[in-house]
Amino acid sequence: MKSQTFFLLFLVVLLLAISQSEAFIGAVAGLLSKIFGKRSMRDMDTMKYLYDPSLSAADLKTLQKLMENY
């Protein structure tokens, strides 16, 4: 009975360690993406990179309104 209890306790501690390390790795990856600024590593606003000289301000406003709920 002692070995089963020890094994269960060991597995619970191992599961907690794995979940904590996953959160830590995710936080480090988020920090690195902010530091290096890779576009593929973070969600970028689609309107930020939209530039076409043939579009007027009214066209851009209409596009932004259409993309609000997208």
Curated annotation (Swiss-Prot):
Domain of life from the UniProt record: Eukaryota
Residues found modified as Phenylalanine amide: F36
Annotated keywords: Amidation, Antibiotic, Antimicrobial, Cleavage on pair of basic residues, Membrane, Secreted, Signal, Target cell membrane, Target membrane
Glycoprotein in keyword set: no
Signal peptide: 1-23
Subcellular localization, as worded in the UniProt entry: Secreted; Target cell membrane
Cellular component aspect of the GO annotation: extracellular region; membrane; other organism cell membrane
Annotated GO biological process: defense response to bacterium
Tissues and organs where the protein is expressed, per its UniProt entry: Expressed by the venom gland.
Propeptide feature ranges: 40-70
Function: Antibacterial peptide.
Family in the record: Belongs to the non-disulfide-bridged peptide (NDBP) superfamily. Short antimicrobial peptide (group 4) family.
Entry comment, domain topic: Amphipathic and cationic peptide with an alpha-helical structure.
Name the record gives this protein: Peptide BmKn1
Taxonomic source organism: Olivierus martensii (Manchurian scorpion)
